Each structure stands twice: as C-alpha cells, then as structure tokens.
Amino acid sequence: MRTLWIVAVWLIGVEGSVIEFGTMIIEETGRSPFPFYTSYGCYCGLGGKGKPKDDTDRCCFVHDCCYGSMPDCSPKTDIYRYHRENGEIICESGTSCEKRICECDKAAAVCFRENLKTYKNKYMVYPDSLCKEESEKC
C-alpha cells in the first residue's frame, strides 16, 4: 500500500521529497495529495501555464515559483527532514538547498490548508488545454 501511495504521489507531479511533501499535505489538510492536488487547476501537478484558477491553484503557482528561485538546488530529488512543534512545521537543518526546499513545501502545504474552504472540485483533474491565458510572472 505504501508503494502504491508513493507511486501515486510521484505521478501527480509533486516535486521535492515526495514522502515529506505528501505527508505535510496530509497533516495540514487531512487530504491525500492524490487525488486532491494531482492535476488541480493550471499549476498543481507537472508543469504549469496560464492563470491560476483560484487560491488553491495559486498555492501551486507560488510553489513552482519558489522552486524556480533556486536554480542551484535539485527540488525534485533532494530529501529534507522536518518535525512539528505545537502544530507548526519546522524545517530541520541540512544543506541550504534542503532547508529552502522544505520551506517551499511547507508554504504550499499551509497554503492548501488555508484555502480548503474555497477548494473547487471542478478544478480537480483540470485539462491543461483550458489553461490558455497568458502566464503570470513569478
């Protein structure tokens, strides 16, 4: 079952340390990354183009921008460690890249939680072909 979950998370395009980011999302939202954030809107999942459809999609847009701001790091493969204190995610010390990747993932997971009330099922498994507007700059 754990292997299936790992494969599902990988297929949705979650970057960074798949296990840690997926766990953060579950802890913050009570929802599994798959299927809720697999291909939500124009930015959740692999790639991203167009204008974010809502605040949840904007979380993914900002997450993509965060990863893009660290060209010397490998957010798709670097593994980081974190723990929780009083309910808050604390990124542990590691390399500078690991810490920055963790902070990007933390911000996205918290953003997902903060926008649970406005999550729209109509944007879950949203076709890329509908993301036609000009992309915003980070």
From Swiss-Prot:
GO terms for cellular component: extracellular region. Expressed by the venom gland. Residues 1-16 form the signal peptide. GO terms for biological process: arachidonate secretion; lipid catabolic process; negative regulation of T cell proliferation; phospholipid metabolic process. It is an enzyme of class 3 (hydrolase). Its cofactor is Ca(2+). The active site is at 63, 105. Its EC number is 3.1.1.4. InterPro entries: PLipase_A2, PLipase_A2_Asp_AS, PLipase_A2_dom, PLipase_A2_dom_sf, PLipase_A2_His_AS. It catalyses: a 1,2-diacyl-sn-glycero-3-phosphocholine + H2O = a 1-acyl-sn-glycero-3-phosphocholine + a fatty acid + H(+). Disulfide bonds join 42-131, 44-60, 59-111, 65-138, 66-104, 73-97, 91-102. One of its GO terms (molecular function) is calcium-dependent phospholipase A2 activity. Keywords: Calcium, Disulfide bond, Hydrolase, Lipid degradation, Lipid metabolism, Metal-binding, Secreted, Signal. Gene3D superfamilies: Phospholipase A2 domain. It is found in: Secreted. Ca(2+) binds at residues 43, 45, 47, 64. PLA2 catalyzes the calcium-dependent hydrolysis of the 2-acyl groups in 3-sn-phosphoglycerides. Belongs to the phospholipase A2 family. Group II subfamily. D49 sub-subfamily. This is Acidic phospholipase A2 5. It comes from Echis ocellatus.
